[in-house]
Amino acid sequence: MAPAATASTGTKGIVRQVIGPVLDVEFPAGKLPKILNALRIEGKNPAGQDIGLTAEVQQLLGDHRVRAVAMSGTDGLVRGMEAVDTGAPISVPVGEATLGRIFNVLGEPVDEQGPIKSSTTSPIHRSAPKLTDLETKPKVFETGIKVIDLLAPYRQGGKVGLFGGAGVGKTVLIQELINNIAKEHGGVSVFGGVGERTREGNDLYEEFKESGVINADNLTESKVALCFGQMNEPPGARMRVGLSALTMAEHFRDVNKQDVLLFIDNIFRFVQAGSEVSALLGRMPSAVGYQPTLGTDVGELQERITSTLEGSITSIQAVYVPADDLTDPAPATTFAHLDATTVLARALAAKGIYPAVDPLDSTSTMLQPAVVGDEHYRTARAVQSTLQRYKELQDIIAILGLDELSEEDRKTFDRARKIEKFLSQPFFVAEIFTGMSGKYVKLEETIAGFNMILSGELDNLPEQAFYLVGNIEEVKAKAQKINSENKG
């Protein structure tokens, strides 16, 4: 057996085996690197190719060997090349210099804007804040999106999951939230692109430049830092890029004492990458082929995302749901860490209700009278019970027809359809697709609007007037326009 690992900077080892993104490196006796240390491999291979990659130590194998996972492609890497122990985990730049820039998992800029003007770096592996340092007073975080603010309000400094299958609008909803929050709340955001499409990263960057969240002419005025580990990158990069983004956000919270927003798209890809790495390291798979350390991997990331007495990190995370199955181990494990869940439903997207947020499946720990107040709570519960009754009535209508409903049920049915339509909203980031200008709706206007529908004040207005509008005044204006068109 190899002697116990000791701290060593600059110790040189030799690459003995390369299996895809995993490599075994042999070090001198007594000078093994610690687990999670970064190894650097640079030089030319026998074919004359330039090689430069970083790998993270994952296992100590015995016989003076360690097994490491590469953070970039291992093409051209050969046995016998030299690997240097850096003596520390992967570190990324932090602070104001990161705003307006795009980084990879190693904190290297990939936006062709030149080197980072910051000497401050921070390791991506850190402990979660102590229990005594945590902020425990709940405070609602307004998003300007009606369905979220009314039925599943977000907590400042909390963790929110956007759950949905492929193509139901998770990334668009995240883009809208970034846009609304940057305009209404100010403050800084960090975006972690974990295993998603390269095109989406490019679209997001261009969207930020257009909306002014990134000022390309003066980066110091930018409000967001981006960290990408895309689909085409090795599993090591996709597994660690979430931690790189989180480390940048932690600096704004702990050192600058700011309230920060952390967006992660997509947590499922983080789990998926961990599963790939686990298999490459030879671990026995667990349920549905996931890694046996699934709970630990997710917990280590999620427990660092929290509010302290100094500042807060409010995290909004997209969670892909494989085959729309919420009981899959990846989304099910993530559920346990969240303060609010926003579930996107394919059935609503098919009806053209956007955002396609399921008002009955979405939940929040903030929806209680002591936090949001009695009026908000009563309105939200009345909306949900009306929609639940609507769901039950649909089965009756399918069998007996609409004419068989009682007068009371007919009213409930009509109001529920108006509520469903009124939960839709035009987005700023989707203006190019819809041709409609986006709307930010204040919470008071949202509550007042739904109260008017529930009370029957708007029973005489046509249903289509409630579709893709902001507040209730816009509904009335749209209804007037529809009536005048019908008369004409």
Curated annotation (Swiss-Prot):
Does Transport show up as a keyword for this record?
yes
Record's bilayer topology term: Peripheral membrane protein
Subcellular locations according to the entry: Cellular thylakoid membrane
Q: Which GO terms describe its cellular component?
A: plasma membrane-derived thylakoid membrane; proton-transporting ATP synthase complex
One annotated GO molecular function is:
ATP hydrolysis activity
**Keywords noted in UniProt:** ATP synthesis, ATP-binding, CF(1), Hydrogen ion transport, Ion transport, Membrane, Nucleotide-binding, Thylakoid, Translocase, Transport
SUPFAM superfamilies to which the protein is assigned, alphabetical:
C-terminal domain of alpha and beta subunits of F1 ATP synthase (SSF47917), N-terminal domain of alpha and beta subunits of F1 ATP synthase (SSF50615), P-loop containing nucleoside triphosphate hydrolases (SSF52540)
**SMART domains in the cross-refs:** AAA
EC number(s) per entry: 7.1.2.2
Q: Which InterPro entries match?
A: AAA+_ATPase, ATP-synt_VA_C, ATP_synth_F1_bsu, ATPase_a/bsu_AS, ATPase_alpha/beta_chains, ATPase_F1/V1/A1_a/bsu_N, ATPase_F1/V1/A1_a/bsu_N_sf, ATPase_F1/V1/A1_a/bsu_nucl-bd
For this UniProt entry, what is the primary localization, expressed as one broad class?
Answer: membrane
- List positions binding ATP: 164-171
Catalytic activity, as annotated: ATP + H2O + 4 H(+)(in) = ADP + phosphate + 5 H(+)(out)
Q: What does this protein do?
A: Produces ATP from ADP in the presence of a proton gradient across the membrane. The catalytic sites are hosted primarily by the beta subunits.
The entry's family comment says: Belongs to the ATPase alpha/beta chains family.
Q: Relate the assembly described in the record.
A: F-type ATPases have 2 components, CF(1) - the catalytic core - and CF(0) - the membrane proton channel. CF(1) has five subunits: alpha(3), beta(3), gamma(1), delta(1), epsilon(1). CF(0) has four main subunits: a(1), b(1), b'(1) and c(9-12).
Entry protein name = ATP synthase subunit beta
Q: Which organism is it from?
A: Prochlorococcus marinus (strain MIT 9211)
Q: What is the lineage of its organism?
A: Bacteria, Bacillati, Cyanobacteriota, Cyanophyceae, Synechococcales
